[in-house]
Amino acid sequence: MKKTIIVTMLILLAVTSAAFAKNKAVTLPTSDIQVYFSPNGGCTEAIISAISKAKSEILVQAYSFTSAPIAKALVDAHKRGVHVEVVLDKSQRKEKYTSATFLANMKIPTYIDSAHAIAHNKIIIIDKKTVITGSFNFSKAAEDKNAENLLVIQSEELAEIYSKNFMAHKSHSEGLAPKY
């Protein structure tokens, strides 16, 4: 497993410069990994597309979550019967445009991770086989203004590792109650 991850990372490094020049998604021939860059590189669209295909479970960890389109996609998945859970950094409890309250109000289990100086994760795990991660915060600024990156990785092994990490953070987080 460790060797597979190292080889995958080396391949990613080899194609990063080409992907950056095109600012488009790149599917690597030896792995099912897509690479996106922002600004305006389709990161939000890739996330929404993956969420829309979810069948059973979506686990989200986020530092900054103000993206209305991503929040809406999670709510739509929840309404389709997909189990959705979200763990957010403590800053999202008071952030002006946070999606935290919206998600909690829509009956999506939402938790605040206050155990760390910053819970700086940007992770979505879908159906125990897809991992979305990178520097990309789930925000409009990340899509339109910031230089960010996003990986969409198809790997049950990696999804299991990230799911265990999600559960560890959820276990020390506080549930966010709906406001209405």
Placement of each model-derived feature along the sequence:
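Boundary/entry segment of secreted carbohydrate-active catalytic domains
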Residues: 26-42
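Solvent-exposed loop/turn segments at secondary-structure junctions
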Residues: 64-68, 90-94, 116-119, 130-131, ...
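Bacterial N-terminal signal peptides
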Residues: 8-15
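Structural recognition of the beta-strand scaffold that forms the well-ordered cores
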Residues: 34-36, 59-61, 85-89, 111-112, ...
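Signature of lipid phosphatidyltransferase scaffolds
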Residues: 24, 131-180
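Boundary at the C-terminal end of the N-terminal hydrophobic targeting segment
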Residues: 19-23
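Primarily the HKD phosphodiesterase
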Residues: 47-108
